[in-house]
């Protein structure tokens, strides 16, 4: 539904809007046009949870409405909400976390032509979002959305959301699509688990890994983040899947091992990371 309670109109946003209330609402719970789509999807989540659904992944492309002074407007938005486990086709037991919702945002932005032109910024977040597990999505210097975990004051469940203002996004000039030839030689995957400071930012570590791996490192993906027994109170473990390939030949084990040693040395010196044993 595009209708929410008027008390929710300024939820999940740092902006302040006047409620766009209906003159004759059917119910007071749905008496106002929404601005953020997250309250709508959260109601769908609660409906399904009440019916014993534990693995919930939903999305919507729809409208958000606002009134600021004498200005009325509406924006087209994409909203995703996920909780529990989900199927990737490869691993049916993957638990949704910050990096899963971040990966979805990256795939959407890359597909739309914004690869390399966005970043995830740790800034002031709406009070409904967990400050330690949320970020603004910034494209060309402007915030066009956010990702993260819903604050424990709202729900004790691990619920993650993504919201992108598509109208705002599409005002940013899209880079030209370029064809990239795929290697006809097999790629090689290597996993690496690192123990780093709890406040370490994965994107910074990925930059060091990419720099050390060079052109033969074709993909980096976070597949696990762990805190708890075995990694230290002020530490966390981040596991990465690294893909290597060469356009001209099949890489040897010796070449891969040399690259891995170079990567490990770089992240140890620049990020203070240790291999998880």
Predicted regions and their residues:
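Long hydrophobic segments that form regular secondary structure
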Residues: 49-52, 58, 64-71, 80-89, ...
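A general structural signal for short secondary-structure junctions and capping/turn motifs
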Residues: 30, 48-52, 68-72, 127-128, ...
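Conserved alpha/beta core surface patches that mediate binding of polyanionic ligands
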Residues: 2-7, 35-83, 161-175, 214-231
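Extended, well-folded interaction surfaces typified by the phenylalanyl-tRNA synthetase beta subunit core
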Residues: 1-56, 190, 243-247, 251, ...
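A carboxyl-terminal module marker
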Residues: 9-11, 91-277
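Residues forming anionic-ligand binding surfaces in small-molecule and nucleic-acid pockets
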Residues: 18-23, 63-92, 184-191, 235-245
């Amino acid at each position: 539904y595009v209708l929410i309670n008027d008390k929710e109109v300024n939820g999940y946003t740092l902006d302040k809007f006047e409620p766009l209330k209906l003159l004759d609402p059917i119910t007071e719970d749905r008496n106002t046009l929404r601005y953020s789509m997250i309250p709508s999807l959260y109601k769908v989540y609660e409906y399904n949870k009440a019916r014993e659904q534990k693995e919930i992944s939903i999305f919507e492309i729809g409208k958000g409405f606002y009134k600021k002074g004498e200005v009325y407007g509406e924006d087209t938005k994409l909203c995703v909400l996920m909780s529990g486990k989900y199927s990737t086709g490869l691993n049916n037991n993957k638990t949704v976390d910050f990096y899963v919702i971040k990966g979805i945002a990256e795939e959407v932005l890359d597909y739309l032509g914004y690869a390399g032109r966005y970043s995830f910024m740790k800034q002031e977040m709406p009070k409904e979002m967990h400050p330690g597990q949320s970020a603004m999505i910034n494209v060309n210097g402007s915030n066009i959305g956010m990702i993260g975990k819903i604050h424990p004051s709202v729900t004790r469940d691990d619920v993650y959301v993504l919201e992108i203002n598509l109208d705002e996004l599409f005002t940013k000039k899209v880079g030209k699509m370029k064809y990239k030839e795929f290697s006809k030689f097999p790629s090689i995957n290597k996993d690496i688990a690192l123990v780093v400071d709890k406040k370490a930012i994965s994107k910074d570590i990925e930059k060091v890994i990419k720099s050390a791996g060079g052109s033969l490192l074709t993909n980096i993906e976070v597949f696990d983040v762990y805190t708890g027994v075995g990694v230290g109170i002020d530490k966390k473990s981040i596991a990465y899947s690294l893909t290597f390939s060469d356009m001209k030949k099949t890489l040897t084990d010796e070449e891969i091992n040399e690259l891995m040693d170079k990567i490990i040395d770089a992240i140890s010196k620049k990020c203070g990371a240790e291999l998880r044993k």
